[in-house]
């Protein structure tokens, strides 16, 4: 029975170690994801707060209006001053980070965005001399704003985009722009096609944004034309941003609860390993206790063997998680010390 119990304890010990490997890796990965999620949520809130100050709106449609209504709306939109209408097309690739070093070089087409000149009032773009570009810097002719690092690739860029006759204006490298439609997401070093504002109901790509004055005029037109506002309505950027903020906060809370569950399992696993080890070496430690001695070599071997798992996991995932190693050493040492105090 003694031999059988010893084997059982040994099997349980190594099985628990295997479980610990899985749980430790899971805790660290999920903790790392939680930190990223918290940082992203902060950026979403900050970006949304900034965008809300612009007081812009988007015209949404669930059903295409009749040709007569479309014509009327196009007339009204066309009559709006340029300052009340903005065109914006996000690039295909957006990042959740503003750290340029963490981004990868992408195809020109994937990192291409379109804006009307007046968007430069909202989004800061600087030229190669670090001077901020303004709408008045351009005559109205469409232009490609290209990061200076692509200077040798300009012919290829024009060819790939099908814009051989478009003028090029070089801008400073490594610029980061907050996306106007997605708070907390950023365009990094994109090629920007800037053009005169297009005032029409829809664009082939991207969105048309309206100032509060432009939105007010459109709302009046929608009411006058007696259009069903469930099929055609103006939605403020603020209301859409509020949804984005709520969704990110919900994801953060879910991640927090998940990590709490992971950490609980992790602590339980450490307790189980320590208890099994002490039971496994109970007779040997009992002899040491009779002579009021502590088997330092055996305990040190256990601690080292146990902490190697946590140490390797931390080095592979996040070095900041090396604090888990210290926690385990302190926890296991206290548990073993308390065990010997009772003997």
Predicted regions and their residues:
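N-terminal Sec/SRP start-transfer signal
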Residues: 1-25, 343
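Interfacial "coupling" helices/loops that link adjacent transmembrane helices in transporter permeases
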Residues: 3-7, 269-305
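N-terminal membrane-entry
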Residues: 243-267
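Nucleotide-cofactor and metal-assisted catalytic machinery
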Residues: 37-252
